């Protein structure tokens, strides 16, 4: 059996289909890359109100992901209906009246469950964290929050400002 090294090397050099190339300057920025991933993670939600995804990153490496949804093993809201809607609870109020967890909470829990240290990490989330998630991110040691869509929670913003966590709105590049 004869192995042709040149052909093998060429096949490894071409990660794209024939005729498709990607120049280094056309690659997405790290912010764009991780925010796209947060939006992709959000597609796993079974929440009937909002699709949120989060990606925790350190040194440009993904540590954990999370999306909003009920705890593992429980019936999804897409099957049971939205408790908050049934009770007439407005968005942004009474977070405890919900069967689900927020994306940031699930990402923190996944990291803890698998023994991953997220202190000093950055979280990319497609919606600005609520006050409950802000407090958890502060105590988890997150250094930076990059969010895409604003969320009107003044207390969250005040606590994050006081904590010294860098908070940036991602507006695309």
What does each model-identified segment do?
Residues 2-173:
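Zinc-dependent deaminase catalytic domain
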């Amino acid at each position: 059996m004869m192995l042709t090294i040149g052909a093998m090397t060429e096949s490894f050099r071409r990660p794209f289909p024939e005729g498709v190339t990607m120049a280094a300057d056309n690659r997405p920025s790290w912010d764009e890359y991780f925010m796209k991933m947060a939006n992709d993670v959000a597609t796993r939600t079974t929440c009937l109100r909002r699709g949120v995804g989060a990606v925790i990153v350190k040194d440009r490496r993904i540590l954990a992901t999370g999306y909003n949804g009920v705890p593992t093993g429980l019936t999804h809201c897409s099957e049971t209906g939205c408790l908050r809607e049934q009770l007439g609870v407005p968005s942004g109020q009474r977070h405890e009246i919900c069967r689900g967890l927020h994306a940031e909470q699930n990402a923190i829990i996944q990291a803890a469950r698998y023994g991953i240290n997220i202190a000093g990490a950055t979280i990319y989330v497609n919606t600005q964290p609520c006050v409950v998630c802000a407090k958890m991110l502060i105590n988890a040691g997150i250094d930076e929050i990059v969010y895409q869509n604003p969320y009107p929670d003044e207390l969250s913003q005040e606590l994050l400002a006081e904590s010294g966590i860098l908070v940036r709105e991602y507006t695309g590049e």
